[in-house]
Design a protein with these regions (language model features):
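Extended alpha-helical targeting/anchoring segments
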Residues: 1-505
């Protein structure tokens, strides 16, 4: 096993007190991200897998596995807390002295590492989610609604092992960050890093010992229930339309939460979801007491090399059964005045969000009103970019765009007040973000859509519809049901696979 950097170069940086990474690479043509997760993470909590599928068909270049964090940061009830001994005392969280966003900014700064050019930006950093209700730390909003699920408002982990799959080079790079400690010599730190890498390489080299999850006999169909009846949701839509008619808002996104039993391991749902609903942002995050499985189509905010990007998706049609039908649906979507007006409203909101942190006159709409195709649907998409002003950082950019207008409404703050009034329960994870702050302090995040939260044998899926002046309440109710279907279809697929394993097929 060849390790980079060499021990002497490592020791020099260590002596200067610089954080750095140690890494090794191997050929990956016989390994997949899924098999690697089963080998190296198994059932260990505080691990994750991030993947990507572009256009519903082409795998993205990088897939990322992270595990064994040295720290976990979270926000509970508006207060930040951190566990710096996660590997030895997983329940030992201490409150942070600063307000949550200030504490997070300090953690991002603390976690910066200068990576070599041969490694991608996500080879080290902090990874996780910020739930929708983190916006209460950014805007003045009423107290949240009741929270029957009870997960933290945010969780971010800093893995000591990151496994990077490069689909272009057919290579796996295993990376372990090292941060100098006064009580540990450079030789000892390097030896421990080598041991961590060796353990992962040994696990990857071993045959897959995983047995498919099995399911006890029972129905395979998943029948979800909602926290909102159809009649209640239709009344919510009618109330929102009254606010629109009164001039309070132009649009608001109203959601409901569906749930159904799910007794299989959460990773079984992820494996099914990546097959039935591939998307640009595929993610599996295991936090021990709960797991997150998602296939989001939409960027929230990206900050890369000084450029801030927001890509609003608004306006939807199903994919056609034939190329001609697909093209006809595209033409119909682009000609739909209601869809175009809604998209333009959210494009303007995205431009304003970027403008809050971008240099003067740098905000540009680089593409607008083009169609992006996914496995099941197509959307109208636009792309907004701006150059990050030097007085702001990636966290400022995230706060400027949080939550996305496509899951809240316009004007955003008034729309969120109406969401609090009309929705019955705290949103929690839904409409927040999943992503990472890289070792360079950059950001890649997506909106939490088409996502299941699995806790205590139950999967929760939240979906919403954008309400405008001419919305039909029954149609908006059906849109929520349709958007949630992909996750429950994946659950049925996972159950079918497990049932076949039980029968020995």
């Amino acid at each position: 096993m060849q390790i980079e950097p060499q021990a002497t170069a490592f020791a020099k940086r260590y002596a200067r007190g610089e954080a750095q990474v140690v890494w090794t690479s191997l050929v990956s043509d016989l390994e997949t991200p899924v098999s690697a997760v089963l080998k190296v993470a198994g059932a260990r909590p505080m691990s994750f897998l991030l993947e990507s599928v572009e256009g519903g068909a082409v795998r993205g270049r990088y897939s990322i596995i992270g595990l064994d964090p040295d720290l976990v940061w979270r926000t509970v009830a508006g207060r930040a807390e951190i566990n710096r001994g996660m590997r030895h005392q997983p329940d030992s969280f201490a409150p942070c002295n600063e307000a949550p966003l200030a504490a997070l900014r300090a953690l991002i700064a603390e976690s910066r590492i200068e990576l070599p050019d041969v490694l991608p930006p996500m080879a080290a950093g902090i990874f996780g989610y910020l739930g929708y209700d983190m916006v209460r730390l950014m805007e003045e909003l009423p107290r949240p609604n009741p929270d029957p699920i009870g997960i933290p408002d945010a969780v971010l982990v800093r893995p000591t092992i990151v496994v990077v799959f490069d689909a272009v080079k057919d290579a796996i790079t295993v990376v372990t960050p090292v941060r100098p400690q006064n009580s540990i010599t450079a030789d000892t730190a390097f030896a421990r890093a080598r041991e961590r890498l060796s353990a992962i390489i040994d696990a990857l080299d071993a045959p897959l010992a995983h047995s498919p999850p099995t399911l006890q006999a029972g129905p395979l169909t998943v029948w979800p229930s909602s926290n909102t009846t159809p009649a209640e949701y239709e009344r919510m839509v009618s109330a929102a339309k009254e606010y629109i008619a009164a001039g309070d808002i132009f649009q608001v996104v109203l959601s409901q939460r569906f749930e159904a039993p799910f007794e299989l391991p959460p990773f079984a749902l992820y494996r099914a979801l990546r097959r039935v609903n591939p998307a640009p942002f595929l993610y599996f995050l295991d936090f021990g007491g709960f797991s997150i499985v998602g296939s989001s189509p939409e960027i929230l905010v990206r900050v890369r090399e000084g450029t801030v990007t927001i890509r609003p998706l608004a306006g939807t049609r199903p994919r056609g059964a034939t190329p001609n039908q697909d093209k006809a649906l595209e033409t119909e979507l682009l000609a739909d005045e209601k869809e175009r007006a809604e998209h333009l409203m959210l494009l303007d909101l995205g431009r304003n969000d970027v403008g809050r942190v971008a240099r003067t006159a740098s905000v540009k709409v680089t593409d607008q009103f083009f169609i992006e195709r996914f496995s099941q649907v197509m959307h109208i998409v636009s792309n907004v970019e701006g150059q990050l002003d030097g007085k702001y950082d990636a966290l400022d950019a995230l706060a400027a765009g949080f939550p996305a207008g496509t899951v809240s409404g316009a004007p955003k703050v008034r729309a969120m007040e109406i969401i609090d009034e009309l929705e019955q329960e705290k949103r929690g994870l839904y409409a927040g973000s999943v992503g990472y702050f890289s070792a360079a302090g950059e950001l890649d995040s997506c909106i939490v859509l088409r996502t299941a939260l699995i806790k205590d044998g139950v999967m929760y899926v939240q979906a919403g519809a954008g309400i405008v002046a001419d919305s039909n309440p029954k149609s908006e109710q059906q849109e929520c049901v349709d958007k949630a279907k992909a996750l429950f279809r994946a659950a049925e697929e996972a159950k079918r696979f497990a049932s076949a394993a039980r029968r020995g097929q």
